[in-house]
Amino acid sequence: MFDKTKKIYVSDVTLRDGMHAIRHQYSLEQAVRIARALDVAGVDSIEVAHGDGLQGSSFNYGFGAHTDLEWIAAVADVLKHAKVATLLLPGIGTIHDLKQAYEAGARIVRVATHCTEADISKQHIEYARHLGMDTVGFLMMSHMTTPRHLAEQAMRMESYGAQCVYVVDSGGALNMYDVADRFKAFRDVLKPETQTGMHAHHNLSLGVANSIVALEHGCDRIDASLTGMGAGAGNAPLEVFIATADRMGLNHGCDVKTLIDAAEDIVRPLQERPVRVDRETLALGYAGVYSSFLRHTEVAAQRYGLSAFDILIELGKRRMVGGQEDMIVDVALDLLQRRDARGAGAH
């Protein structure tokens, strides 16, 4: 059942996950305009970073138009209500990067690991608490392990000092029952004061539904983005989620019309590739592939004359996870070899 008096913590990810949709190319002016609208609308936090987190700007993930610190400082400078959040993936970002992000204005950090690798977050979570940051554990690709094992990983993050732990559906592969099971498992083992969060992707068109089910099972924080701006088919669209929550009489604290206008007038025109469910983004959810593989896969498909759908399905079969972007080309070359072998056999 829903507690309609409980305030939903609304966490916007347009300026972090949304980076993937435009290959990390937001200008400072665009970032500030989006942040201002979100702040006026009443969201609680605005995550700002390269799509792959602090120091994600690289050959492997793609170079950003600006540094993380430039984006963070620009956004922090204009906010009156919302707090600046950022993302850190241990192994990409370091505690030194986190300290600089804090100095630039970030006050919340989500420390993200693969769903079975919470142990690598210890140093970063402890340091974030030392800085006095609101510290969140972020268990990516949560569909790839059982609810019980995911809850055990959440307990580890909690033991390191995480004040909130997220179910992160990076592949957009979870359905409502999967989400319910994971939040039930979290509540069974986490301390009552430890908050929980839901980060949905819309690859099976379930981003909003999964977020609502998470709330039904005690979730405290919901990630969403304007127009769903994010990797793959995007995240739960913020304006749709808030409109739904509003119709249900839930306490969200946001202005629906301001979000709808910002989505349509500011964010949608920036999309060079529509953020939607289509053949390729559906393949992500269907095969359970990391959503940010989408743009890299489409480049490889074009280069080698292959179907992006076929590459994504094969990546899913091989259970590739975030950080293995280099395997996209390997898979493409294997598919090319198979195709050539079939062609040779036909003669």
Swiss-Prot record:
Domain of life where this protein originates: Bacteria
Keywords: Aromatic hydrocarbons catabolism, Lyase, Manganese, Metal-binding
Enzyme Commission designation: 4.1.3.39
Catalytic activities: (S)-4-hydroxy-2-oxopentanoate = acetaldehyde + pyruvate
GO biological process entries: catabolic process; L-leucine biosynthetic process
Example of a GO MF term: manganese ion binding
Transmembrane segments: none
InterPro entries: 2-IPM_HCS-like, 4OH_2_O-val_aldolase, Aldolase_TIM, DmpG_comm, DRE_TIM_HOA, PYR_CT
Catalytic machinery residues: 20
Binding site for substrate: 16-17, 170, 199, 290
Signal peptide boundaries: none
PROSITE patterns: PYR_CT (PS50991)
S-S pairs: none
CDD domains: DRE_TIM_HOA (cd07943)
Residues that coordinate or bind Mn(2+): 17, 199, 201
Residues under site feature: Transition state stabilizer: 16
Positions of the Pyruvate carboxyltransferase domain: 8-260
Family: Belongs to the 4-hydroxy-2-oxovalerate aldolase family.
Protein name in UniProt: 4-hydroxy-2-oxovalerate aldolase 1
Organism: Cupriavidus necator (strain ATCC 17699 / DSM 428 / KCTC 22496 / NCIMB 10442 / H16 / Stanier 337)
